[in-house]
Curated annotation (Swiss-Prot):
Catalyzes the transfer of a ribosyl phosphate group from 5-phosphoribose 1-diphosphate to orotate, leading to the formation of orotidine monophosphate (OMP). Pathway: Pyrimidine metabolism; UMP biosynthesis via de novo pathway; UMP from orotate: step 1/2. One of its GO terms (molecular function) is orotate phosphoribosyltransferase activity. Pfam families: Pribosyltran (PF00156). It comes from Leptospira biflexa serovar Patoc (strain Patoc 1 / ATCC 23582 / Paris). This is Orotate phosphoribosyltransferase. Orotate binds at T132, R160. The keyword Transferase applies. It catalyses: orotidine 5'-phosphate + diphosphate = orotate + 5-phospho-alpha-D-ribose 1-diphosphate. Belongs to the purine/pyrimidine phosphoribosyltransferase family. PyrE subfamily. Its EC number is 2.4.2.10. Homodimer. It is an enzyme of class 2 (transferase).
Length: 185
C-alpha cells in the first residue's frame, strides 16, 4: 500500500478513531475495554473512506490471491467499505457488487437478509471495520454461505487482537487487516 495512504490513515486513526478512557467502553462483542476504535470516523468521511478504499484495492486485496464477484459484510460497519471498494473497482473497469447483510431478515417486504445483486454471486470477500471476537463477521459469513456464496477471505481496518481472526480461521476465513490494536499503544 502506498505509504502515504497508510500513513494518512494511521494519523487519522490516532487523531479521530482511537480513544482511551479509564471508564471502559462496551464493545459490539459485549466485552469491555479502555481502548475504543470508532472506525466510522474513517468510513463515514468522504476523503478518509476514499483513501481507505485505495489502500484495500491497491495493496491489501492483491496479496490475498483471491477472485471475487462481491464484497460485503454485516451492516453497518461493512457497508461504506463495501460501497467504496465496489466503486473503486468500477472506476478500474471491473464490476464487484456490494452486498449488505442484515443482522436478521427484514420483517416486511421480501424479508431478505441480504441486499444487493447476490443471486448469481458465487464468491464474496467479507469486510468489516473492526474485528474483536469476529462475531459480526462470522454472522455475515454464515448468512452468505447459507445462500451458496463462497467466503474464504476477509479484510478489515483494525484487528483488536482479541481472538477474532483466529475464530474466523476456524471457519476457514482468513482475515487481513491494515492495522493492529498494538500499533496504537
Amino acid at each position: 500500500m502506498s505509504h502515504s495512504h497508510r500513513d494518512a490513515l494511521f494519523q487519522w486513526m490516532k487523531t479521530y478513531v482511537y480513544r482511551h478512557s479509564e471508564t471502559p467502553f462496551r464493545l459490539a462483542s459485549g466485552l469491555e475495554s479502555q481502548h475504543y476504535f470508532n472506525c466510522k470516523e474513517i468510513t463515514l468521511h468522504p476523503e478518509r473512506l476514499s483513501i481507505l478504499a485505495e489502500c484495500f484495492i491497491e495493496e491489501i486485496i492483491p496479496k490475498l490471491n483471491i477472485e471475487f464477484q462481491a464484497v460485503g459484510g454485516l451492516t453497518l460497519g461493512a457497508d461504506p467499505i463495501a460501497y467504496a471498494i465496489s466503486l473503486g473497482y468500477q472506476k478500474r473497469g471491473k464490476n464487484v457488487f456490494p452486498l449488505v447483510v442484515r443482522k436478521e431478515s427484514k420483517g416486511h417486504g421480501t424479508g431478505q437478509q441480504i441486499e444487493g445483486f447476490w443471486k448469481d454471486i458465487k464468491t464474496c470477500l467479507v469486510v468489516d471495520d473492526v474485528i474483536t471476537t469476529g462475531g459480526s463477521t462470522l454472522k455475515a459469513v454464515k448468512v452468505l454461505r447459507e445462500v451458496g456464496i463462497n467466503v474464504t477471505k476477509g479484510i478489515c481496518i483494525l484487528d483488536r487482537e482479541e481472538g477474532g481472526s483466529e475464530n474466523l480461521q476456524t471457519e476457514n476465513v482468513t482475515m487481513t487487516s491494515i492495522f493492529a490494536k498494538s500499533e496504537f499503544f
